[in-house]
Each structure stands twice: as structure tokens, then as C-alpha cells.
Amino acid sequence: MSLKKCIVKQQKIFFDFLRFCIGSVKEIPDSLKEADWKELYAIAQKQALLGVLFYGIRRLPKELAPEQKLLMHWMAMAEMIRKQNIKLFQDSVKVCLNFENEGFANCILKGQGNALLYPDPYMRTPGDIDIYLSGGRKKIMKYVDRVCPNQVMRYHHVDFPVMKTAIEVHFTPSYMFCPIHNRRMQKWFEEVMGEQCKHRASLPDGYGKIHVPQVSFNVIYILSHLYRHIFTEGIGLRQLLDYYYVVCDFCKVYQISSNHLENFSNPSVSLSKGSSTFSPSPSSSGSGDVAGDAIALPEFWYRKRSLCPKGLAMIAYATELRLFVRCYTALVGSGAYVRCYSIYDDYYFYRR
């Protein structure tokens, strides 16, 4: 077998096992018998998914697990990720309380809020702390300049280096490149962020409470964030996995299951939860997979809330989500590994 075929084979085994790790499939994949665990470790390390795969390894019989030396090393890395998460949870509580005491309503974006959606909140590889502050750009920058002078302000955030953990203070959660779409998005943020700053979540093992967005917000925000990153820094599987668990949480909160998907075509169906109303429609893919079909829901959210004149979708048309659906299918679908590096084959950026 050629080297290229071996690599592709191990990539497919990786995705088979990843689906098992995240619970998308319940049975241990047969392909795991041919796994090159060193190659799977390398892929997981590159994609920041070592903790996620170790969560699955713990449920494997001994004969399918990696050899002892690699297993012990993997275990050590998973323990390091667990300790990093503990540190981020503790720092998130401190940061939230500090800004509250300074008079800023706040909300932790992505990061440790997403970690709470995972089966084990310590299995996600953590990053920095992204925190939204209310009050407006001028008020926030006045405070930041007083505490940490000479910080470079970007459009939507500014660095706030007051502790070892990196902190980004956001004036707005995100933005879009197209000025028209960005204006609509910022208007929506102004309407809903006050509600997000009131939504508290308890951290595991009594580490405290932080403000995190509601799932009805995240299902739009995280997708729009990924959509923008495709054209800038790129996206990895950790980001896709974050959105997978957001969609799973969305389906759980709104009590969506495969049996209810046929109701999506009925515009009179209303799903209400957490002061939000959602009237979705089936995705064009028609996959029958709950999480996969829910990929199409953010576009309908905007349309039903009349944020886009004449029914234009704020984030993108369904065709503009095609690339993301292809990436996402690699996680939740039954097909083989989907390459997602070429983004211009059937894509028209800002074509409207």
C-alpha cells in the first residue's frame, strides 16, 4: 500500500474513532483494529483533540487500546489538559467577578462556556479567555488604558494582560467582513447581549459560576465565528467539535429529535425556550441526522426574527454554508473523511 493510501486510511480510522469518542456512534468501530495509534496521536495533537480521543480510549477494551508507553504518555497529556481547564475555570470566575465589581456586565464567549457542553468538561483543550463587556468601546478602553496602558485596540476586542492566562476583552462578540451584514449583526448583538450577560452557569466541582451565552445565541454566534475564520486564520476540528456540541445542546434544549424533523417544514411550528422563539425548516442536505440538519437552522433564525430585509439571510445563504456542512459531515455523518481545504471551488464570496 502506498504512503498516501496509508495516510488516508488512518485519517478515516481517526474520524471513525472520533465519532465514537463524541457519542455520534455507540459501537466501537471495526476499523480500529487496523489503527496506527502513533498516527492517530499525531492527528489528535495537531487538531488539539488529545483529551477528546483519550475520553474514548478509556472506554476501549485492553486489546484495542494503544501500547503501554504511548498510553501512559497520552494519559499524562490528558491530565495536563485537565489541569489547564481547572486553571481556566478558576481564572474565568476571577475575571468575571473583577469586571462585575468594576461595573461591567459580562459574558464569557466560547472557551470554558463551550467546555461545559462536553461529556467531560475537562477533556477540551482550553485556550484563552474571551469575555464580552457591556458599556461600549469608549468606557471599556478607558478602563483598559488605566489598568494596562498602550494596548492595541482592534475592531472587536483588545488584549488585557493582567494575568498569565491570556484575556481578550470584547466590545462586540464578533463581526462580518461585509459592511451591510456586519451592521445587521451588530444591531442584533445590541438587542440580545444584555440577556446573555444575565445567563449564569455553574462550573464543575464547585469552582463557581460564570456568565455564558444561551444556546439560542451560540448556535448563531459560533457558526458566524467559524464562517469568518475560514477566510482568515482557518478552522480546525476543535472548533468544529465545539459547534457540534452547541448543536447537540440546541437540540436538547428545544427538544428536537429525528422524529420532529418533519415538523420543520411547517412554519407554524414554534419552539420556545429561554425567551426565544425558533421556527426552523429542514436543511437542504436532508441527511436525517439531527445535528447535521440543525446546521441549516441559524439562517432561519435570522429570517424569522426579521433581521434581514426581504428575507436575505444574515449569516449566509444555504449555499454559502455548503463548505461548513461538508466539514461538519466528517464528524457526524457516515461517510469517509471530507477534505475541506479548497474553499473557492464552488464559492462566491460577497456575490450579492
Show which residues each predicted segment covers.
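Conserved NTP-donor binding/palm subdomain of two-metal-ion nucleotidyltransferases/polymerases, i.e.
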Residues: 2-127, 132-275, 286-352
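Ser/Thr/Pro/Gly-rich low-complexity, intrinsically disordered segments
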Residues: 280-282
